[in-house]
Amino acid sequence: REQVNMSQRMRYVYPKSAKSGIAQALWRSWGIVRDLKKDGVSLYHGLSGELPIGIRKSGIKSVVTIHDLIFMRHPEYYNPIDVMMYRAKFHLTCREADRIIAISRRTAEDIVELGGVNPKRIDIIYQSCGVRFANVVSEEAADETRRRYNLPERFVLNVGTIEERK
């Protein structure tokens, strides 16, 4: 929440009755469209590569951000049932979305190739980080940090996961 600069026209909406993980997943896939229409939402942005079923028929415009298609390029890293679900959601999303945001040129190419999407529906918007991470520290502070953590003069910091697919 702290990453979003809220305006008076924005608000967070959560499922009222979906307390369990399964119920929340069902709400995100089916129930949310009813709530969006009831609340007069005119634009929905799916941030995690999927859109709710029926969003196009609802008349609500939609945008989806797709980060990658690893589950299609390397299904061996996933449970086969997950791959089936992700594929189904991906193809539905490709049909339903008014616009698609790809986070890289490679992802955009994959969406065209694997999803049959017209490239004119895709915008490439590279990810970045907030300005609070752009602070340049003094040489003394950097030296102190290297000493504290016993780091060499030059090193690569990876804040990713140790999963093989990443």
Where do the model's predicted regions map?
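Carbohydrate transferase catalytic cores enriched for Leloir-type hexosyltransferases
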Residues: 1-166
